[in-house]
């Protein structure tokens, strides 16, 4: 049985994402089916390993048994046997922010001016398209809506942030993993981010605060 912490009533897709309505996305999952969900998990890179300057990350997985009642719905909301590498999620966030184009990850310790001031650098997008532009831009709008109508813009100061929280249950009585992912809608600060706190608890309450602290430093550095 798929449940939510509270009854949300009738929702459109924007509001369903904003309040993280498990039931809404479970319903969509049942309509789409396991095959289509697995296909797009692969297409968007969420289950593929990511190559970061020659270092290959672990692959993720979307393992939903069509024959097992409720398993497709659970997998569609990131539970069940789902696994996603934070680097793959970061790649996906960059793709959304970049109108559907994946951005090649790079390992960089720091880049500064002679005075020690951090500077930004140009990032060359890879040729891989994760999403079409319309879909990516719609997701950007939805993630911006999350901040304005749920997380609260006041919690992020002047950051033009688009984000989604996640609270991943891990079972065996352990506290859930806290996730907070997204990007800044600012061409002068083209920053995507992923914060995952193992057994940290609620997503926005825990990981969101960490993301905000780091982003404030980066955003106000120049």
Which functions belong to the PLM regions below?
Residues 1-195:
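Beta-lactam-recognizing serine transpeptidase/beta-lactamase-like catalytic domain environment
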Residues 25-27, 202-206:
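Extracytoplasmic/secreted cell-surface and envelope-processing proteins
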Residues 85-91, 206-213:
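Short amphipathic alpha-helical face segments that pack within enzyme cores
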Residues 118-120, 124, 210-222:
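Short, gly/Ser/Thr-rich active-site loops of penicillin-recognizing serine hydrolases
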Residues 190, 202-204, 221:
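Intrinsically disordered, low-complexity acidic/polar segments
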Residues 197-200:
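Ligand-site clamp/hinge motif
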């Amino acid at each position: 049985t798929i449940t939510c912490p509270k009854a949300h009533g009738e929702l459109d897709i924007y509001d369903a994402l904003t309040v993280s309505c498990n039931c809404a996305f479970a319903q969509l999952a049942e309509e789409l089916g396991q095959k289509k969900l697995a296909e797009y998990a692969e297409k968007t890179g969420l289950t593929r390993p990511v190559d970061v300057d020659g270092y290959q990350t672990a692959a993720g997985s979307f393992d939903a048994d069509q024959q097992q009642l409720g398993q497709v719905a659970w997998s569609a909301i990131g539970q069940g046997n789902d696994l996603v590498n934070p680097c793959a999620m970061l790649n996906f966030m960059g793709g959304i922010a970049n109108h559907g184009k994946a951005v090649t990850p790079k390992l960089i310790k720091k880049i500064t001016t002679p005075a020690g001031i951090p500077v930004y650098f140009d990032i060359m997008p890879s040729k891989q398209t994760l999403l079409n532009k319309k879909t990516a831009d719609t997701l950007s709008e939805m993630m911006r809506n999350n901040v304005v109508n749920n997380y609260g813009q006041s919690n992020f100061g002047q950051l033009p942030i688009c984000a989604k929280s996640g609270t991943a249950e891990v079972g065996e009585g352990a506290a859930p993993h806290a996730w907070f992912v997204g990007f800044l809608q600012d061409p002068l600060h083209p920053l995507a981010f992923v914060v995952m706190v193992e057994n940290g608890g609620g997503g926005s309450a825990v990981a969101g605060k960490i993301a905000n602290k780091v982003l404030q430093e980066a955003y106000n550095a120049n």
